[in-house]
Amino acid sequence: MTNATPTPVIVTGAAGKMGREVIKAVVQADDLRLYAAVDRNPDVFSLDAGELVGLDTLNIELTNELEPVLAAAAQEKQPCVMVDFTHPSSVYSNIRSAIAYGVFPVIGTTGLSDEQMNDLTEFTEKASMGCLVIPNFSIGMVLLQQAAVQASQYFDHVEIIELHHNQKADAPSGTAVKTAQLLGDLGKTYNPALVEEKEHLAGARGSLGSENIRIHSIRLPGLIAHQEVLFGAPGQLYTLRHDTSDRACYMPGVLLSIRKVTQLQTLSYGLEKIL
C-alpha cells in the first residue's frame, strides 16, 4: 500500500554496511522517503547518499551533525523515523535526542546497558512516543528464538554460541543476550552443576548470564552474523542454528519496524513484539 505522504526516514550510521542497506531499502519503498543520512566518517562528508550506495543521485548529502537534522525533521508534518546503526558509545544519546525532537527511533545498534534501557523506557513513556530496539531484524532469527523457547521445555542444559565479523564492537551480541533472556523468562533453572569447574584460562567457558546460560562469542573475518543454540541431554544434542549470508535479509524487518514504530507510545524490545 502506498501512502499519499511517504514517511521521512533519517539513517544514522549511514556509511556503515547496515546503513547502506537501509538507505537502499528506504529508497525502494513507495511509502517511505529518505530524509537525511548521517555518519561520522569524514571520508563521506558531503557525498550524495545515492552515490554512496550505488544508486542515482538523491540530492541528499551526508552530514556528520545529527542535531540540526532532528531539529528540521521536527518541523515536518509527517512523523519522522530515525533508523540507527551507529555504535554502542553514541546510540543512547542519539535515542534521547530523537525522542526530544519528536522523531521515532528504530534502533539496530546493540550494546545498551540495562540502566540505559530502563531510562529510555521511562523517557519514551513520558513523551508517549514509540521506540523500537531490535537486536536482530531477521525473521529467521525470531523463528529460531521461538523454537528455542519450545525446546527448553524438554532440555535442562543449554549454551549459546554467537559468531560475528571482527568489526563488531560489542560482545556478546544483543541477539544472543535476547535469546538467553527469552529462555530465562520461562522461570527455569538451566545447567545444574554436575562437577566443580575450574577455568585455567579466564573466560574459557564463556560469559555466564543471570539465566545461568553461557554465551560464547567468536569474532573472525569472513563471518557476518551467526548463532547456535545447543541443547544437551543424555545421549542426544539438539542444535538450532541461524546463518546470515547477506545483510539484505534484515531489510524486511527494518521496513516493518519503520512502519510500526509511529503507532507505539513507549519503548519495545525485540522484533517479535511487532510481528
Swiss-Prot record:
A Pfam family: DapB_C
Annotated active site residues, numbered on this chain, are H164, K168
Going by the record, the broad EC class of this enzyme is oxidoreductase
Does the record carry Oxidoreductase as a key word? yes
Enumerate the UniProt keywords alphabetically: Amino-acid biosynthesis, Cytoplasm, Diaminopimelate biosynthesis, Lysine biosynthesis, NAD, NADP, Oxidoreductase
Binding residue positions for NAD(+): G13, A14, A15, G16, K17, M18, G108, T109, T110
The reactions it catalyses are: (S)-2,3,4,5-tetrahydrodipicolinate + NAD(+) + H2O = (2S,4S)-4-hydroxy-2,3,4,5-tetrahydrodipicolinate + NADH + H(+); (S)-2,3,4,5-tetrahydrodipicolinate + NADP(+) + H2O = (2S,4S)-4-hydroxy-2,3,4,5-tetrahydrodipicolinate + NADPH + H(+)
Q: Kindly give the InterPro entries that the UniProt entry links to this protein.
A: DapB_C (IPR022663), DapB_N (IPR000846), DapB_N_CS (IPR022664), DHDPR_bac (IPR023940), NAD(P)-bd_dom_sf (IPR036291)
Per its record, what are the GO molecular function terms?
A: 4-hydroxy-tetrahydrodipicolinate reductase; NAD binding; NADP binding; oxidoreductase activity, acting on CH or CH2 groups, NAD or NADP as acceptor
Biological process (GO) annotations held by this record are: diaminopimelate biosynthetic process; lysine biosynthetic process via diaminopimelate
- Location of the protein in the cell: Cytoplasm
State any GO CC term: cytosol
Residues annotated as binding (S)-2,3,4,5-tetrahydrodipicolinate are: H165, G174, T175
Report the sequence similarity comment from the record: Belongs to the DapB family.
Sorted alphabetically, which NCBIfam families does this protein's record hold? dapB
The function of this protein is: Catalyzes the conversion of 4-hydroxy-tetrahydrodipicolinate (HTPA) to tetrahydrodipicolinate.
The entry's protein name is 4-hydroxy-tetrahydrodipicolinate reductase
